[in-house]
Every structure is written in C-alpha cells, then in structure tokens.
C-alpha cells in the first residue's frame, strides 16, 4: 500500500468478503447475480457477481499497510501499520460482547517513530505479529509482537492514555515486543516460513535475511537488491519470490546463494507479486500504471542441471479491466479468481482461465485438464468410428500376431480380421511369391527365384516377343477362340494370380473348387468362362442358385448363358448387352462383356475396376499378345501406384515400384504395420535400405513401444532380423576383464551365440565344450559364482550342485534356457553375482545377497519388474 492508492484483501475465512483500504477500511460482501437482479446500492463486479458495502472504519489514519488476522475468531480483526510506526488492532463490525473485544484498539508502539512498511501474522502461532519498519540508527527494524500476552508493570512498561481529549475510553499501549531483529537496517517486506513458526524471512535494505527466533544472534542472509514483496509459494514452501524495480527473483531456500530464476525485467517498476493460493506454481505480478497482470506458470519448471542453467517457465498476460490497476488479491478458495481495484476504487471480479492441456493416449483415449477438473471424451455407444480407426486396427492386429506367420503367409489376412479384400489379396500374393520362389530355387538355384518377388510387371517384360496365339475349342460349344500360348513366364504369372498351382499343367479346376467352397459362385463361373468352359460355368451358377445363401437370379444368368450364339446380329447378343448394364455383380457383368466382345477387344473385362486385379491380370495373360499385355500391365501398375491399392503388389512386387505403391497406401491409410511386414517379406537389400521403408519400420516399432507392447516389439525385431540380417544391431554391452579391461566374450570359442545386452561365455551346456574360465587377454581367472564358487565360464550343468535332483533341465529340449543359465549376472550395488541360473534359484526364496556378511537387498533394487506390458493386462 503506497500513498493513497487503494489495496485489497480477501477475508481468510469468509470466501464472500473482502476489504478495500486506502484512507479508510471498507468491508464488502460479494454475492452472485446469476439468477437475481442487482440490488440497490450494490456495485457490479462482473456479469455474475456484485458487491455490497457492509461497514466502513475511519478510526485509523495514516495507514501504510494492513494484515488480516488469520484465525476465525475474531473474524474481522485487522492489524494496521501507520506512518509513525505504530501497529493498531482494529475491527470491522466486531461484536462488542466478544471475548476478544479487549484486542480492539490495542496499539504496539516502537521506541522511535518511523514508518511501518509491512505486517505479517504468524500462520502457526496466530498471536504473533511481525512488523517491518524503516531504519533507525538506534533501534531495530523488525519487531515481533504477541497480541495476547499478559503483561505486568514489572516486566513490560505499560500506560493507559486517552486517544484524544474528547474520548472517555482508554487503550493499552504495548511498547515491549517479544523479539527485536535487524538492527541499524530497514525492513521493506516480511513473511513467515510455513514450515516452522520460528523462521522469519525479511527483505532488508540490501539483503534477504532468514531469522531463527530460537537463536536471534545469528541469521542467514544473501545480498541482493530484490528485497521487496517477499512471499512464499503456498504449495512449495522452499520457493520464495521477491522483486526490485521491474525484476522478479525466484529463490530456493535450500540453495539460498542466488536466485534459481530471474523473470524477464519489466519496463515499469513492480508494485505487487502474489502466489495463487489455489494453483501450484502460479505467480501474478503487477507493474505501476498498468492494466495488465502478468502470470508466470512454474508448474512444469524442470530441475536445473547445472549451476548456470535456468529453468524455463510459461508466461502469459491477462487484462481484467480497461483502467489502470492499483492492486489485486487472489481469492483464497475459488480457483484462479481475483479481485482487482483501480485508483478510483472501481473493482472487478475476474477469473483467470487455464490453458487447456490435451492428452491423446496411444490407445486413442482423449482427455484434457482444465483447472482442477479432468475430462475424458467418451464415444457414443452406436458410434463405430473408433473401431474404424487405423490405430485401433493395428493394435488389435498386433495382439493377434499379425504379420508374424512366415510359413503359411496367407493366414496373416485372417489374423487381420479377414475383413479387407486388399489385405487378403496382398497376403495371398506374398504367399504365392514365397512358395514359387522356394520351388524355383530348388529346381534351378540362383536362376529365377528373385524374379518372382519382382512382380508380374517384370516377369512379363522378360518374355516379350516369345509368345504366339493359337485357337482353342470351347467346352460345351461348337466354337473356337484365340488364346495365347502359355510360356514359362505366363504360367508363373497365372500361378501368382492363384489360378493354377505348381507345375506345367494349366488346370484351373482346383481353383474353381476352392471358390465354390467359399461361396464365390459368380467369380468361379467367370473364371470357368474365361477358360472357355461354358458348361462348367453354367453348372456353377446352378449350384449357387440352389445353395442356402445363393441368389435365385443366378438361374436366370445360367439360362442366358445356355442360349449363347456366336452370331453378331442375333437377338441374344442385343439382349445380353442390355442386361449386362443392369447387373450388380461385376463378375456377371464381365461374363456377358466377354461373350459379346469383338475378337481381341476385351476392354469390358480388363477395365472393370470392381473385378479383382489378379483375375484381370490372369485374363490378360491368356488373351492378350505380348505388346498388348505389356501395355496393359504398365497402365494398370501406374493406376495401382497412384491409388495405393495393395492388389497392385502383384504387379510391382517388392521393388522400388512396390515402395512407391506402399507409400501411397500409407499416405492414404496410415497403416505402417502392413507396410513394414510386407516390405520385410522378400524385398532385396536396396529396397530395405530405402528411407521410406526404414521410416515405416521405425515408426511401427515406436508405436509398439508407445502401446507398451514390448514383447510384441521384441517379436517384431526378431522377425525383422530373420528376414533382414543386416538390421541386427551390434552388441552394445560386453563383460570386460577387471585387470586388462578387454572384452571377455570376444575370444570365447565355446560361445555359440552372443546375446543382446549380455555377455556369455562357456554357455553351451555340453560337458564336451571347452571352458573359458580365464580372461583371453591377460589370463587372469574370471570371478567366481557366489553360490557354486566355481569360476565363471564353467557351464552350470558341470557345476557340482548346479541343479537339484528334482530340478533337472532337459538341455536338448530347452537349449536357450541352458544358455541363459550360464550367463554371468551381478548386482550393480554390491557387485556380487554368479551364474544366472543359480541366481534365479537363490532369489526365488531370498531377497538378500547370497554372499556372507553382505546385507544388500539385491532383488528389491530392480524396479523394472513393476512395469507390466500392456498385452498382459486384462481389460
């Protein structure tokens, strides 16, 4: 409080009262006006609140500072510091029959008159009142008074005097304080430290000082100019703020040598700083002649790493009103609420709205925090958008081990839910590629095995100018059609399309039977027709019509096919051309398009986008010449790449074109999971090293880690290292000799495998293997196992007492377990250890180190056991 500018204080125990003090004390009552009109005489504070004047106290002139008594009773007791140094206890509407009525009007008088700058009630012992005064060369500047002490004339000199000539009541003048501190210096600000009622922090003339009332002869201090407005963070009692001119300093009392943080200097002098009582680490500052209050959020302030490192804060500004602000006061309980007052006593009730912090979990849960409230976004019961999200799909697929089946590759589409036809086509394509690559490598190693994974586009290009057409008879018709002679490359293309199986026998019968079993009647009939077997096509349609889930319209189509005639101007051809446009099933449409097409012109079949790519490509391999086929495959490949259609992998293979196609697919769907598994399946090394492929793989690994699917990520890494040996990282940790510092494991001939993260030696578990019990560099003996006392490197199976009779391990069945049992493990605290198998056996029943006289609780030091992989948590 400075000059005649008003200050404002909230009542500590009445959330609806505050006092404005300048030349007089005015008590106001705040009430809500949401559902009521503004009362006569009330002052509008905001749209939702108004203030009513309850009482005015003009008995204490020359006010310089005011402090509200912290206890509930008496409820309206205030201490007023005056320009002459006196501290007067006064009240606003105090009941005169109260047992504390003797406190009203009590004065505390220093020896020498000078201005009282600050007052502070002790939060623990509420009867103690600290006063900070200006400097006097013969007096102390920090006086601590006990407002309820029982004085006697022998101990404390007292006198009763009249306040004025016209008054009849007398008051008690107290002239002897409990404590006197800060001699020959000025005190500009005060605050008690909440953690101890005996500690007082004072902003003196040139330093901040901490006084311990248990030993007043000593004090802890730090030289600084920032001695005004000292205030303690109510949520972090070791954090203190003070200011000087336009700069705020933040102190940590545990490291009191210098400020831990200095806020940005303001162009105008500061007049007030205050911590928010309802929000952790929120500091408000006000400068002279300003209508802006600056807020500094230290909630997320990191701990400084070095002496010169300053933590960062979040700064923002709010404007409660248009006029200059004289002072403000935080509400003690309402969140982020404050009252501001202008120099002409205009008041505003203002709430600082929090920044909304959003958190989107890796499992698509959305939450946000606003103030003390935490909100969660829940999906509507009938809203299936969450199930359609690719992140949810990838998470469920990861749980089902999607992509990890390397034997029956086609099964991966079932693990994906068997809902996406593109995924089904992709995994069947990869399955056929793997199958025929292995078959070709067995017949002619190094010949054409790699060509299979290059896709049909490359296969077709390798056979240009080698194929001629010939006429073939229809089955069920007296007719012949031109069909290309199938060379080895076209047969391979048909095999990749799934129409025929291994061998040179071009028989689509097994494929038709599989389609019939799956209920794909229309597709089976179309494939039979494309192979010039109209009789088989009609039989399939009739079977489909008579099945439980069949369509009776298939009978109509079968009847239409049975009346096929080769005459160009026939009524049948005219009616079928019209009927084709009315059919919904694409395979029925292309059947009539094929029958009504001119010789060599099959656009109605080749460009029907609803027909599977593999069927269109197989059709093209049977009916198009080399030039037409190459042109068609090139055009279809470009369409698939642009659309990101996974069926196009059949054409591009796992080549650079395949990466381009997969890039479009990932851009469209975000499915890095499928992209990663697909590219790992059989891509050459130059494709695997493509930046895009590595980006998909690393993002999928990070995604698994974010979901806490650490086991799944480990399985993926193992799967990746099998298909791409170059991806296996080098060992990052090895056991070194204590004497020479060289790696023990590198020269161990008995080691069949190097484990990631551990070094192992002599681990085969077979007594015939050589033992490495000494350092290969300096020949010093290796440490001994704390349990069997045999040098490390000796296999557990050959250690005496290595296993009990009832704990025999079948090493032939569990070789990996035998290797792990021989690993050397040790405690990072006490450095004791031994064979991993022995240590596991010991710590099943004990928590303490097995070494005598060692009291280390080795097993309890490892906290990683508390982390539970997400896939093991039951929903």
From Swiss-Prot:
The keyword DNA repair does not apply. The keyword NAD does not apply. Zn(2+) 4 binds at residues 830, 832, 849, 854. A zinc finger (RING-type) spans 782-863. The GATOR2 complex is negatively regulated by the upstream amino acid sensors CASTOR1 and SESN2, which sequester the GATOR2 complex in absence of amino acids. In the presence of abundant amino acids, GATOR2 is released from CASTOR1 and SESN2 and activated. WD repeats lie at residues 58-100, 111-155, 182-221, 223-261, 265-306, 395-437. It is found in: Lysosome membrane. Zn(2+) 2 binds at residues 788, 835, 838. Zn(2+) 3 binds at residues 827, 830, 858. GO terms for molecular function: zinc ion binding. A zinc finger (C4-type) spans 735-781. Its main location: membrane. InterPro entries: MIOS/Sea4, MIOS_a-sol, WD40/YVTN_repeat-like_dom_sf, WD40_repeat_dom_sf, WD40_rpt, Zn_ribbon_mio. Keywords: Lysosome, Membrane, Metal-binding, Phosphoprotein, Repeat, WD repeat, Zinc, Zinc-finger. Zn(2+) 1 binds at residues 737, 740, 775, 778. It comes from the Eukaryota. The modification Phosphoserine is found at residues 759, 766. One of its GO terms (cellular component) is lysosomal membrane. GO terms for biological process: cellular response to amino acid starvation; cellular response to nutrient levels; central nervous system myelin formation; negative regulation of TORC1 signaling; oligodendrocyte differentiation; oligodendrocyte progenitor proliferation; positive regulation of TORC1 signaling; protein-containing complex localization. As a component of the GATOR2 complex, functions as an activator of the amino acid-sensing branch of the mTORC1 signaling pathway. The GATOR2 complex indirectly activates mTORC1 through the inhibition of the GATOR1 subcomplex. GATOR2 probably acts as an E3 ubiquitin-protein ligase toward GATOR1. In the presence of abundant amino acids, the GATOR2 complex mediates ubiquitination of the NPRL2 core component of the GATOR1 complex, leading to GATOR1 inactivation. In the absence of amino acids, GATOR2 is inhibited, activating the GATOR1 complex. Component of the GATOR2 subcomplex, composed of MIOS, SEC13, SEH1L, WDR24 and WDR59. The GATOR2 complex interacts with CASTOR1 and CASTOR2; the interaction is negatively regulated by arginine. CASTOR1 and CASTOR2 convey leucine availability via direct interaction with MIOS. The GATOR2 complex interacts with SESN1, SESN2 and SESN3; the interaction is negatively regulated by amino acids. Belongs to the WD repeat mio family. This is GATOR2 complex protein MIOS. It comes from Homo sapiens.
């Amino acid at each position: 409080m400075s000059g005649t500018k008003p200050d404002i204080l909230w009542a500590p125990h009445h959330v609806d009262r505050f006092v404005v003090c300048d030349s007089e004390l005015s008590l106001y009552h705040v009430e809500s006006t949401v559902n009521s009109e503004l009362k006569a005489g009330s002052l509008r504070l905001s749209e939702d609140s108004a203030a009513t004047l309850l009482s005015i106290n003009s008995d204490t002139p020359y006010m310089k500072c005011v402090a509200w008594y912290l206890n509930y009773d008496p409820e309206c007791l205030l201490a007023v510091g005056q320009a002459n140094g006196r501290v007067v206890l006064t009240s606003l509407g105090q009941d005169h029959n109260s047992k504390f009525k003797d406190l009203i009007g009590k004065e505390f008088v220093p020896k020498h008159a000078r201005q009282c700058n600050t007052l502070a009630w002790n939060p623990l012992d509420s009867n103690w009142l600290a006063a900070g005064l200006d400097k006097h060369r013969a007096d102390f500047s920090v006086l601590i008074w006990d407002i309820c002490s029982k004085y006697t004339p022998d101990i404390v000199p007292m006198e009763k005097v009249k306040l004025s000539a016209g008054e009849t009541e007398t008051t008690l003048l107290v002239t002897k304080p409990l404590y006197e501190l800060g001699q020959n210096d000025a005190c500009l600000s005060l605050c008690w430290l909440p953690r101890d009622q005996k500690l007082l922090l004072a902003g003196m003339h040139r330093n901040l000082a901490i006084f311990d009332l248990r030993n007043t002869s000593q004090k802890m201090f730090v030289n600084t100019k920032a001695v005004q407005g000292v205030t303690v963070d109510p949520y972090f009692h070791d954090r203190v703020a003070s200011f000087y001119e336009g700069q705020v300093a933040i102190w940590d009392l545990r490291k009191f040598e210098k400020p831990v943080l200095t806020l940005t200097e303001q162009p105008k002098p500061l007049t007030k700083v205050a911590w928010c009582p309802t929000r952790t680490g929120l500091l408000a500052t006000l400068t002279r002649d300003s209508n802006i209050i600056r807020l500094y959020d230290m909630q997320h302030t990191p701990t400084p790493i070095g002496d010169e490192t300053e933590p960062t804060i979040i700064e923002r500004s709010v404007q409660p009103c248009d006029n200059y602000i004289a002072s403000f006061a935080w509400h003690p309980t309402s969140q982020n609420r404050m009252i501001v007052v202008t120099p002409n006593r205009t008041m505003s009730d203002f709430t600082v709205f929090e920044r909304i912090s959003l958190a989107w979990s890796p499992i698509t849960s959305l939450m946000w925090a606003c103030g003390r409230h935490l909100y969660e976004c829940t999906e509507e019961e009938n809203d299936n958008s969450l199930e359609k999200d690719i992140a949810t799909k990838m998470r469920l697929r990861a749980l089902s081990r999607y992509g990890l089946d390397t034997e029956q590759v086609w099964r991966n589409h079932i693990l994906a839910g068997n809902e996406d036809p593109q995924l089904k086509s992709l995994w069947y394509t990869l399955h056929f590629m793997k199958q025929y690559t292995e078959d070709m490598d067995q017949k002619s190693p190094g010949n054409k095995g790699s060509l299979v994974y290059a896709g049909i586009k490359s296969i077709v290009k390798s056979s240009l100018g080698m194929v001629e057409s010939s006429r073939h008879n229809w089955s069920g018709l007296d007719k012949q059609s031109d069909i290309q002679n199938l060379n080895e490359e076209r047969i391979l293309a048909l095999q990749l399309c799934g129409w025929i199986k291994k061998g040179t026998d071009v028989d689509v019968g097994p494929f038709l039977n599989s389609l019939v079993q799956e209920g794909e009647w229309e597709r089976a009939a179309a494939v039979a027709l494309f192979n010039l077997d109209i009789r088989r096509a009609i039989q399939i349609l009739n079977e489909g019509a008579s099945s439980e889930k069949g369509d009776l319209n298939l009978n109509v189509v079968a009847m239409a096919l049975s009346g096929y005639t080769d005459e160009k101007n026939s009524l049948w051809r005219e009616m079928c051309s019209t009927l084709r446009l009315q059919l919904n099933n694409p395979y029925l449409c292309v059947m009539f398009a094929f029958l009504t097409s001119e010789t060599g012109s099959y656009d109605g079949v080749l460009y029907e986008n609803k027909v599977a790519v593999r069927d269109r490509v197989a059709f093209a391999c049977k009916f198009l010449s080399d030039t037409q086929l190459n042109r068609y495959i090139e055009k279809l490949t470009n369409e698939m790449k642009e659309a990101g259609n996974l069926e196009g992998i059949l054409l591009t293979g796992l080549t650079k074109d395949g990466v381009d196609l997969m890039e479009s697919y990932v851009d469209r769907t975000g499915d890095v999971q499928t992209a990663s598994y697909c590219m790992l399946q059989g891509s050459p090394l130059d494709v695997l090293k493509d930046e895009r492929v590595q980006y998909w793989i690393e993002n999928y690994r990070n995604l698994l880690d974010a979901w806490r699917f650490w086991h799944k990520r480990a399985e993926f890494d193992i799967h990746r290292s099998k298909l791409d040996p170059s991806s296996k990282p080098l060992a990052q940790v090895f056991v070194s000799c204590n004497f020479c510092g060289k790696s023990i494991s590198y020269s161990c001939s008995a080691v069949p495998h190097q484990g990631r993260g551990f070094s192992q030696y002599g681990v085969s578990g077979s007594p015939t293997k050589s033992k490495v019990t000494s350092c290969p560099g300096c020949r010093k003996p290796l440490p001994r196992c704390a349990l069997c006392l045999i040098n490390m490197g000796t296999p557990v199976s050959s250690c005496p007492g290595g296993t009990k009779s009832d704990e025999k391990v079948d090493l032939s069945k569990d070789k990996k377990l035998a290797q792990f049992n021989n690993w050397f493990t040790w405690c990072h605290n006490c450095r004791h250890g031994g064979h991993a198998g022995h240590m596991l056996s010991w710590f099943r029943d004990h928590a303490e180190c097995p070494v005598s006289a060692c009291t280390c609780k080795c097993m309890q030091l490892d906290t990683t056991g508390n982390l539970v992989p997400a896939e093991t948590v039951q929903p």
